[in-house]
Amino acid sequence: MADRSATAIAAVALATALLVTSAGAQPSDLANYPDLRGAWSRFVVRGLGGQASFDQTKPWGLGQQAPLTPEYQKVLEDSLADQAKGGQGNFVDHALCHPAGMPFMMVATRPLEFVVTLHTTYILVGGSDHYRRIFTDGRDWPKTIEPSHSGYSIGRWIDTGGDGRFDVLEAETRGPFKGRRTYDATGLPLHFDNQSVFRERIYLDKVNSNILHDEITVVDNALTRPWTVDKRYVRKPEPHPDWTEAFCYEGTALVGLGNQIYYLSADGKLMPSRKDQPPPDLRYFNQARK
């Protein structure tokens, strides 16, 4: 009798083990997730200067080659023309220290940090208080989403190799979003309706685990079709990176008045930021015109 009981218990244990093995990676064990620790800087493409562009494989400016509609192609051209005169173009909100939001924050003007937990993956922009939450707890989309800069993200980890380890994070981010948004500092525009959808596949490189990919597909009414870019990041070699504070407002010398941006000089005077700029309206300021 005891032998039959022991045999039955062993059979149940074996069946359980086989079930766990066949089910692939188990979400209850962090050891089954990729090691994303460290500071991740944007991948610098040789010959392109390492600028903080959205598509790192294309030249700066119009060379980004986003499939813009004619209306939004003109928005980009007007933005670049304004920047050529010293202005900010569509980048004005970010220049005034508004949060970058999606997808600009993934350009990684400062290194990114990925914090993986069982139910949420956090993406932090180094040196600032700007971050994303990607919920991986199996939730559905809420009926109402509050407007935000980063959007609302739901994802899931996938074991593509069937080896019991998660290796790809798939995520979708929806709005409504806040503010006038751009892909990067060129002013490459997203639609002003703020209803973009971003779909991502985040994974370590198969050959070099110190390279991280983020395939971002953008669905936006400023585009003629969905646009996919494979953004890459390089893990810094420091095993214990220091994360120092670096808030935009502490280093900016720009001041917005109405729809104009001016420089604040060292002696506290408002100075023009581009050619042919009208003087600031100082009726409510104690400053002599200059």
Regions found by a protein language model. Name each.
Residues 24-290:
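PEST-like low-complexity, intrinsically disordered acidic/proline/serine-rich tracts
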